[in-house]
Amino acid sequence: MIAKTFSSQGALGKAIPGFQARQAQIDMAEAVAKAITQQSQLVVEAGTGTGKTFAYLVPALLSGKKIIISTGSKNLQEQLFHRDLPLMVDALGFFGNVALLKGRANYLCLDRLSRQMVESHTNEADPQLLTQLVKVRSWSSETKSGDLGECDELPEDSLIIPTITSTNDNCLGKECPSYVDCFVSKARRKAMDADVVVVNHHLFLADLAIKETGFGELIPEAEVFIFDEAHQLPDIASQYFGQSVSSRQVQELAKDIEIGYRTEAKDMRQLQKVGDKLTQSAMELRIVLGEPGFRGNWREALSSPSVARELSRLRESLDFAIDVLKLALGRSQLLDTAFERANLIKGRIDRVCDVSITGYSYWYDTTPRHFSLHITPLSVADKFHEQIELKQGSWIFTSATLAVNDDFSHFTHRLGLKPQAQFSLPSPFDYEQQAKLCVPRYLPEPNSAGLADKLVQILAPVIEQNQGRCFFLCTSHNMMRELGERFREVLTVPVLLQGETSKQKTLAEFMELGNALLVATGAFWEGIDVRGDALSCVIIDKLPFTAPDDPLLKARIEDCRLRGGDPFSQVQLPDAVITLKQGVGRLIRDKNDKGALIICDNRLVTRDYGGVFLASLPPIPRTRDLDKVKDFLSQISVTTQNN
């Protein structure tokens, strides 16, 4: 049945102009069909161009079973639901119901919107935010889904989004005056009735973690579970099987208390004081936690007198909030929920401050305005395995980056998987002709002083000659900022820096300019798809080993050591290989793409483990001569102009 569907005279060939199946795609589709029939686990590494999406959609839709498809990113989730699934549904004549389900932070909350509208009249509102609020209110009367991603007038990084969406903590549930029209409830009900539901890993794992306590109903009772971008699952699972609390939760609580005071309990002036104290104490703790963009060891931070002092003040503010809110119980649903939230947040802070429990990593991270405190299990293998055992069905995991030197054990061990089959699909790209890999000669040591200056000196001529069209992927924010600054001093082509505007705007500007250098870090290493001449060179500053002082890594290393393992080969090296494969994957996106990859790290050729990295990368011809890279890029440029 599968082979027939993928044949030139089959359903796909008839429905999709120019469709040509590849043998690797058929092999994967048959393996997925077998896993569905046998209710087994399957792991497949399938890179760009292999056609993996159709390879799992076809057997899934033909099976007639209830299916959940989970993606790592919202981008892929949207693409699957709006582009790939409709194509397959039409081609196969599928008559089942299909639903898209996102986390509640993506849906407009009508009750919170109406409260914000009232609040905006009583307060000195920012004119720009007020304009956005009015546009959202207008859109709210037209939308069927309530998905804010569909509101074109609203920037994706708008500051009003947290104020007009709900969280698990602040949702009023059935007590909400807008419950009948609630977009989250509608989306969930639709998902419960659907045959195919497209979710993302965060939503799936949040529900799985809730199921662990017996309350997870969000994900319908499916029989087939397919995870695309599955390499992200272990880290995301760690978040959901752990515990966290953030200053954002405290400040949102403070804001809701102030709204309750202004609109429903004007005689309780203490509520204003509660809001002010909560906001102030959260800000003071943020300040003593240090520079933004930092991930630190929470156990160590707690021994700092200034951190202990501000944490104590935050706890006092929460106690004060609980005492005052207790007096307001019964006055309004908003304040009743705020009382519950204050108790929840206090409980979470108590939990993350009990650092005596073994088997967990205690850490914190900071942004310019906020902090988060986390307790994360060092391994989710037992918990994830237990959930799979509880829910008999077919579990299929696929991604472009799962194997390290053709070995899947790093991925399968982290999730406690026991797949009946695991394999990699061969790439359809002709890397011999399409790409060149260079580790330049005379590179400084990766962490040496003046590294940025030296890299700019070596690489500026290549970037200039190529007229930009280049990603420079960095392993740290500091290196990214330093390189961005230096390149702006010496290059004539535009230099874009990640973080100066939103990711989407940065990418759109890069495409529009057509001759830019984009210097970026984490967010651009994966999930970015730039095809054609817009991108013909990817440079990586060094091998992406996680910083040795990262508290999560340190905890995993210690855990590995206690189990008698080798932390470098079992933790640090596999993590870095997977990340490098993701970065390298930005270059060649289809069979017509051509480009050069430059990795500025001698360890690829001077250390034994360099061979593990190289063996895990596509078979790209290698050189150490940057002049050969320039020649290759010149040929690409000439070919493009002639075409």
Q: What residue ranges belong to the model's regions?
A:
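Signature of the SF2 helicase/ATPase Hel1-core->accessory helical subdomain module
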Residues: L62, E78, R83-P86, S166-E316, ...
